[in-house]
């Protein structure tokens, strides 16, 4: 009889609370969280989607090169853009305000580059995917903009807003993956993990209740 193979441990190459929460929603608990410290500056004339997938790959490959054990590394990078203009990950009140003003009454796109690397016996297998979601905000008043900025929830967020927070009240239209906007497209993540031999509850018999990551 063929024995079930134990899942490799999962390493999340990010300390993002949103990505940790999203993995927990699908019952994946990383055995390690190792943020990848890379330069996230866009290259000259680099477009949003290529930037997101490049940064995700650089994060994943950096962690893969640092570890000795076999594991599956999950990395992602989220970029918000209006047209070809990449919005910053806001670090100040003014940056948040400028981003929200730009998003007010307009459609923008959120791109998440996903890179999952399976490292086993020093062999690397890579899965990459870019996922796009279109989001439209209603026209915001100055009062709404100032109030949102006062919450500080847009700090360190792509495009200066936290979609799973108060900014959700601004959305008049969304097309695509909601989890993608939060920072990790779950449908594509599960598909990639499955293709790498990781057993996930969403596609396995009911008796398997969790996506167990070996520790």
From Swiss-Prot:
Secretion signal span: none
Keyword Hydrolase: yes
Protein keywords: Cytoplasm, Hydrolase, Nucleotide metabolism
Pfam families: Maf (PF02545)
The reaction(s) this protein catalyses: a ribonucleoside 5'-triphosphate + H2O = a ribonucleoside 5'-phosphate + diphosphate + H(+); a 2'-deoxyribonucleoside 5'-triphosphate + H2O = a 2'-deoxyribonucleoside 5'-phosphate + diphosphate + H(+)
Disulphide bond pairs: none
Active site positions, chain numbering: 77
The EC number(s) this enzyme carries: 3.6.1.9
InterPro entries per the UniProt record, alphabetical: ITPase-like_fam, Maf-like
Cofactor: a divalent metal cation
GO molecular function, one term: nucleoside triphosphate diphosphatase activity
One GO cellular component term noted in the UniProt record for this chain: cytoplasm
GO annotation, biological process: nucleotide metabolic process
Compartments reported by the entry: Cytoplasm
NCBIfam families for this protein: maf (TIGR00172)
Family: Belongs to the Maf family.
Function: Nucleoside triphosphate pyrophosphatase. May have a dual role in cell division arrest and in preventing the incorporation of modified nucleotides into cellular nucleic acids.
The protein's name in its UniProt record: Nucleoside triphosphate pyrophosphatase
Organism: Rickettsia rickettsii (strain Sheila Smith)
């Amino acid at each position: 009889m063929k024995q079930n193979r134990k899942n490799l441990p999962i390493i999340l190459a990010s300390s993002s609370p949103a990505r940790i929460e999203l993995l927990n929603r699908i019952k994946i608990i990383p055995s390690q969280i190792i943020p990848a410290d890379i330069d996230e500056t866009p290259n000259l004339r680099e477009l949003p989607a290529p930037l997101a997938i490049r940064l995700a790959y650089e994060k994943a490959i950096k962690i893969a090169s640092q570890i000795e054990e076999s594991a599956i590394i999950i990395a992602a990078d989220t970029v918000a853009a209006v047209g070809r203009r990449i919005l910053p990950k806001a670090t100040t009140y003014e940056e948040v305000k400028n981003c929200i003003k730009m998003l007010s009454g307009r459609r923008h796109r959120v791109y998440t580059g996903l890179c999952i690397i399976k490292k086993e016996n020093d062999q690397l297998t890579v899965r990459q995917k870019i996922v796009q979601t279109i989001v439209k905000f209603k026209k915001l008043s100055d009062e709404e903009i100032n109030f949102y900025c006062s919450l500080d929830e847009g700090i360190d967020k792509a495009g200066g807003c936290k979609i799973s927070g108060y900014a959700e009240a601004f959305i008049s239209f969304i097309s695509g993956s909601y989890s993608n906007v939060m920072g990790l497209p779950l449908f594509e993540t599960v598909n990639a993990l499955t293709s790498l031999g990781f057993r996930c509850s969403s596609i396995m018999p009911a008796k398997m209740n969790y996506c167990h990551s070996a520790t």
